[in-house]
């Protein structure tokens, strides 16, 4: 009832664990939703779904990018690509040789999920108000979100508030 689609292309890119998020599935999601809502956070599955939607949209947009290039995408679609890259590199990628990133608690995963999703949602709103995509994707908070996975458990709450306020 669970399938983890191992992906040699991800392994070749040194993305570990090399599990393809689009080909993998679990038939236990309904049961897991109850558990995550009760034990981690009420919005866990909602955040997960937002990330999965972005990853699926990225896969569709990659086909366009391969044919006509990234410049053919609208700023909103380019932002989706950047958000999906953040999900892949900052949330899904794990460095098993790093002292802190070897293991990530569910609390920390939830915080990371919230940061990535919040950045995307706030950026979409800013784009709608006329903000520059280039400025949005080069904001220092992007790097802080990327480094959040290296924050030690005892400093999570303080660092989360700091990054979220950026």
Residue ranges and their predicted role:
Residues 113, 148-166:
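Acidic, low-complexity intrinsically disordered tails
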Residues 1-147:
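P-loop NTPase catalytic core
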